[in-house]
């Protein structure tokens, strides 16, 4: 049936034709209803939830923050097949975690380790790195162990050893961070002039966190966030195609991720690493069923644009 038209008279005598019925963009609610109808047509029903009290995704040797980060780092690229072109990207990716992954790892027990985390940050054993606001990770931060942090600074000192001014700046910054490990710094605490701070920001060592507050970052942090964005997007798209946007754990682990890697020529994190991230970031819920642990895309995960 043709669309109905409405003719409006303007002051200058011109006419304007409005369509009373036009094709509108579907809302998330409409998409959800259509998805449910499609699932009903296949004869499938939602998974039967037994409990939201689920066992940990990763078994920890001990439940210290340091050990938790070490175990998560071990899972970063476990059981992931990638093309040769992505190996360089993986090699350059700093070994760190998203802070919210600890929520996905400990879940209801996270509050018991949060105080230990803050203490480790104050002593400098763990560094909190802030993600750039231009990335799609608003308010998120990463955690890196002191040995990995020092190793990366050593790499950049070697890289700029022939550029005296830059080398001196990086050396002074690293020394300051060792002697005074804080989550963020004022311009007075940094002891750099404006030109030096601006250079460190442009190189990726600092980010402006507030009016007079600077957070610590790293130049190759963008590689980590790039792979993280790919991993979140891949998991979200996979669950969106599933009936009721949910999947049993065993089916998820058996998925051949190498197919996606070959098509997109991109790197992805390992399944347990990305699931801890997705749960901690509120993109996915986990629950127990008669068939074992399962995961379901949340409203936040459905609406998030990567």
Swiss-Prot record:
Pfam families, A to Z: Stk19 (PF10494)
GO biological process: meiotic cell cycle; positive regulation of Ras protein signal transduction; transcription-coupled nucleotide-excision repair
Keyword Transferase: yes
InterPro entries in the record: STK19-like
Reaction(s) this enzyme catalyzes, per UniProt: L-seryl-[protein] + ATP = O-phospho-L-seryl-[protein] + ADP + H(+); L-threonyl-[protein] + ATP = O-phospho-L-threonyl-[protein] + ADP + H(+)
CC annotations in GO: nucleus
Domain of life: Eukaryota
One Gene Ontology term of the molecular function aspect: ATP binding
Protein family: Belongs to the STK19 family.
UniProt function note: Serine/threonine-protein kinase. Has a role in meiosis.
Name under which the protein is recorded: Serine/threonine-protein kinase mug51
Source organism per UniProt: Schizosaccharomyces pombe (strain 972 / ATCC 24843) (Fission yeast)
Taxonomic path: Eukaryota, Fungi, Dikarya, Ascomycota, Taphrinomycotina
Gene: mug51
């Amino acid at each position: 049936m043709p669309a109905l038209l409405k003719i409006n008279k303007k002051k200058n005598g011109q006419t304007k034709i409005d369509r009373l019925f036009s094709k509108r963009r579907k809302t998330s609610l409409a998409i959800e209803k259509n998805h449910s109808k499609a699932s009903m047509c296949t004869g499938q029903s939602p998974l039967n939830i037994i409990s939201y009290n689920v066992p940990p995704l990763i078994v920890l040797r001990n439940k210290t923050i340091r050990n938790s980060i070490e175990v998560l780092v071990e899972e970063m690229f476990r059981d992931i097949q990638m093309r040769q072109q992505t190996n360089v990207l993986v090699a350059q990716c700093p070994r760190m975690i998203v802070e919210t992954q600890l929520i996905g790892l400990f879940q209801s027990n996270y509050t018991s380790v949060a105080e230990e985390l803050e203490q480790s940050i104050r002593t400098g054993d763990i560094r909190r790195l802030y993600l750039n606001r231009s990335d799609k990770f608003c308010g998120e931060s990463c955690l890196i162990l002191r040995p990995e942090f020092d190793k990366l600074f050593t790499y950049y000192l070697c890289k700029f050893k022939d550029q005296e001014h830059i080398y001196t700046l990086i050396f002074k910054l690293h020394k300051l961070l060792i002697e005074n490990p804080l989550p963020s710094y004022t311009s007075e605490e940094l002891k750099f002039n404006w030109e030096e701070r601006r250079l460190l920001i442009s190189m990726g060592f600092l980010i402006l966190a507030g009016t007079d507050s600077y957070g610590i970052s790293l130049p190759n942090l963008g590689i980590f966030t790039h792979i993280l964005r790919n991993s979140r997007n891949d998991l979200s798209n996979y669950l969106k195609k599933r009936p009721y946007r949910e999947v049993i754990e065993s089916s998820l682990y058996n998925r051949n991720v190498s197919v996606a890697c070959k098509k997109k020529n991109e790197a992805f994190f390992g399944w347990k690493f990305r699931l801890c991230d997705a749960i901690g970031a509120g993109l996915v819920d986990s629950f127990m069923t008669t068939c074992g642990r399962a995961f379901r895309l949340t409203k936040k995960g459905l609406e998030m644009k990567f």
